[in-house]
Structures are given as structure tokens and as C-alpha cells.
């Protein structure tokens, strides 16, 4: 737990129940968690919060995870931050699209908390 105390994760999901579930799970593992309720919110917070990793739901109303990822990767201030798609969309074409956008990992919903934590640790260089 001590190793992860400084790992800051920004989580974006439009479902408040899933957002809280992720926040609690990651908090129990010692991560510092910030939340965003949608695509515009995550883009606005990413530059302020300076997270080590960003988790993005793909299917959010308004600015989708796809669009948010593209905008985050196009911005010099946030382009270096590893992105993880967290989505029920598991088709290979979705995973390929994520790779093309520069997304570092794709975790399927319903997610396994152990897999999610391991992915974040790996991307934050704390594996």
C-alpha cells in the first residue's frame, strides 16, 4: 500500500455507482483518486489534477471516452499521461481504435479489481 500512496488516478465515468465503486476500490489500495463525471469534466480536470493515470469510460454522453482520449493526447500538457479505457465494449475493433488513440490499456466491464489495480501500478511504474 505504501508504494501507491503517491499514485494519483483520475477516473471518468458517467455512472455514479461505478464511479464510487472504482473510487472505493482504488482508495483501499492506497491510490489517491480524483473523479470526473464525463468527458468534458475529465479534460478540464486532467491539467489541474496532474494524474499519473487516467481511467476513461468509453460510452459517456456528450464528450465520449474516445473523444476525450483524442483531446487529452493532442494536448501537450496531458499527452504523456497513460490512459486506460474501462468499458463494456469489448469488440476487437474498439480495442484497436483505443490503440490508435494512444490508449495504454483496455479493461473490460465488469472489471476485476485485481486486474485494474495491477494495470494502474504497471502504467504508473509501480508494478
Q: What kind of region is each of these model predictions?
A:
Residues 20-28:
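Charged docking surfaces used in two-component/phosphorelay signaling
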Residues 57, 87:
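Active-site residues of response regulator receiver
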Residues 104:
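Short, glycine/charged-rich "phosphate-handling" switch motifs in NTP-dependent
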Residues 30-37, 45:
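Short hydrophobic/Thr-rich beta-strand motif most characteristic of the beta2 strand and flanking loop
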Amino acid at each position: 500500500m505504501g508504494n501507491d500512496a503517491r499514485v494519483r488516478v483520475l477516473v471518468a465515468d458517467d455512472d455514479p455507482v461505478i464511479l464510487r465503486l472504482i473510487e472505493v476500490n482504488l482508495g483501499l489500495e492506497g491510490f489517491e483518486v480524483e473523479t470526473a463525471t464525463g468527458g468534458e469534466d475529465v479534460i478540464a480536470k486532467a491539467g489541474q489534477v496532474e494524474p499519473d493515470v487516467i481511467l476513461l469510460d468509453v460510452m459517456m454522453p456528450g464528450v465520449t471516452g474516445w473523444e476525450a482520449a483524442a483531446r487529452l493526447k493532442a494536448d501537450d500538457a496531458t499527452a504523456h499521461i497513460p490512459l486506460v479505457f474501462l468499458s463494456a465494449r469489448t469488440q476487437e475493433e474498439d480495442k484497436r481504435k483505443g490503440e490508435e488513440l494512444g490508449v495504454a490499456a483496455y479493461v473490460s466491464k465488469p472489471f476485476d479489481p485485481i486486474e485494474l489495480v495491477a494495470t494502474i501500478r504497471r502504467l504508473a511504474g509501480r508494478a
